Design a protein with these regions (language model features):
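A generic, residue-level signal for flexible/boundary positions that often mark functional hotspots
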Residues: 19-22, 253
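Sec-dependent N-terminal signal peptides
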Residues: 8-20
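C-terminal motif of bacterial Sec signal peptides marking the signal peptidase cleavage site
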Residues: 24-27
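Subset-of-secretome marker
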Residues: 2-10, 29-291
Length: 291
């Protein structure tokens, strides 16, 4: 592979941790509806306190989705190997039901504009990275649905239509209440959650095997849920297998996502097609090499 292809692929996966975070909190409405909206909206602080830890976590998927949109702030920290101390921050807006989003990502001196529309990721790269795109294009895109179909994405982790829906099946042994804390000035209850990879694979033996090889038996996640049952902060830490020079050395990717200003306006359009280069093939090849 030539230098240009390697550089562009690096741009695709440089924000892989961000994609994980976005996916976990987007498209929350997929799956069973479960209950009426009126009864959920009537839920009070008292009813939230009466729930067991597992019940609170199971319910936050639907309650958060009912807000429809929110502002989002993210921090992704990568450690291990050459990525030691690498940090990316992002902020923007998101549609919590279908995953449409617009974020500005900052990594040191570099800034990337990122959009997700109809399960397609678009990134406007920094000038130096954009020079590697063909025909003078300034945006790259990756079809996330196609990426998953081709084995370049993890169901339940990288599916923008999946998100927190798998928390509905958690049992009491998988959830621990850690206490109360404030997130952005809002009182929340802090939970530690262990996600079962067998349930995330949804009966797909091959997918389950792949997830176990990449992530182990369980995925640890922490949630901060407010008195209305809505997720205010989510933290997930993954051990991932990078592609390229790092070889067999796994890297730790910690993603923290905070939601605020529920109901904010979200109006996101894809960039002009004439300025966009499709990098789905390169992304799929890179993902398979890292699996």
């Amino acid at each position: 592979m030539n230098g240009s292809s390697r550089t562009t692929r690096g741009a695709v996966f440089g924000s892989a941790g961000l994609l994980v975070g976005v996916a976990l909190l987007s498209g929350c409405g997929s799956g069973d509806e479960g209950g009426s909206k009126d009864s959920d909206k009537a839920g009070s602080s008292d009813s939230a306190q009466a729930q067991s830890p597992a019940e609170a976590v199971q319910a936050t998927n639907e309650k958060t989705t009912q807000a429809e949109t929110a502002k989002i702030a993210m921090t992704v920290t990568t450690s291990g190997g050459q990525a030691q101390g690498k940090k990316v921050t992002g902020d923007g807006v998101m549609d919590l039901q279908d995953g449409t989003s617009k974020l500005t990502l900052d990594q040191g001196p570099n800034t990337i504009e990122q959009r997700v529309v109809d399960q397609v990721l678009y990134q406007k790269l920094p000038k130096k990275a954009a020079e590697q795109l063909p025909d003078g294009k300034t945006w790259m895109k990756v079809d996330l649905g196609e990426l998953q179909t081709r084995g370049g994405g993890n169901k339940g982790l990288n599916d923008p239509a999946g998100s927190l829906a798998y928390t509905k099946s958690l049992s009491e042994k998988n959830v621990e209440k850690l206490g109360t804390e404030k997130v952005g000035g809002t009182k929340t209850t802090h939970y530690r959650v262990r996600l079962d990879l067998a349930k995330m694979a949804k009966g797909d033996a091959a997918q389950q095997k792949k997830l176990r090889e990449q992530l182990g038996d369980e995925v640890p996640m922490e949630l901060w849920i407010d008195d209305k049952g809505m997720t205010r902060r989510q933290e997930i830490e993954l051990q991932v297998q990078p592609s390229g020079a790092e070889g067999g050395k796994k890297q730790k990717v910690k993603t923290v996502v905070e939601l605020s200003d529920f109901g904010t306006e979200v109006d996101v359009q894809p960039p002009p097609s004439g300025k966009t280069a499709d990098m789905t093939d390169q992304a799929a090849k890179g993902a398979k090499q890292s699996s």
